[in-house]
Amino acid sequence: MYLFFLIVFIFISFSLIFFILLQPGKGLNNTVHSHTKNNIKFFNSIGTNNFITKIIKILAFFFLLISIILCNINSKRIDSDFFWEDNQNNTITKKHVLDKKKLNLDIPN
């Protein structure tokens, strides 16, 4: 499950980069660099880039959603391993109490 989401996450990342770089600039320098008729026809056929901006919004939403899912999956793996090991050894409370005593040695009563 984790591997599937990771592969989809990487694919969405690269496609976001591709579509963001595909957008033409809207400044005056853009006309200097695109004198060919093919570039103008390609970008005008999209319809003032509404299609590309919608795709970018959808991909950005999925990027955020999958990153949250990956974080939750990863944190559950770490937390479950941590509590499983500590429940076997029963060392959480002993170490915790000893650490507090060590920290309070320098403080006068």
Curated annotation (Swiss-Prot):
GO terms for biological process: intracellular protein transmembrane transport; protein secretion; protein transport by the Sec complex. Involved in protein export. Participates in an early event of protein translocation. The keyword Acetylation does not apply. One of its GO terms (molecular function) is protein-transporting ATPase activity. It is found in: Cell membrane. Keywords: Cell membrane, Membrane, Protein transport, Translocation, Transmembrane, Transmembrane helix, Transport. The chain crosses the membrane at residues 2-22, 51-71. GO terms for cellular component: plasma membrane. It is a multi-pass membrane protein. NCBIfam families: secG. Belongs to the SecG family. Part of the prokaryotic protein translocation apparatus which comprise SecA, SecB, SecE, SecF, SecG and SecY. Its main location: membrane. This is Protein-export membrane protein SecG.
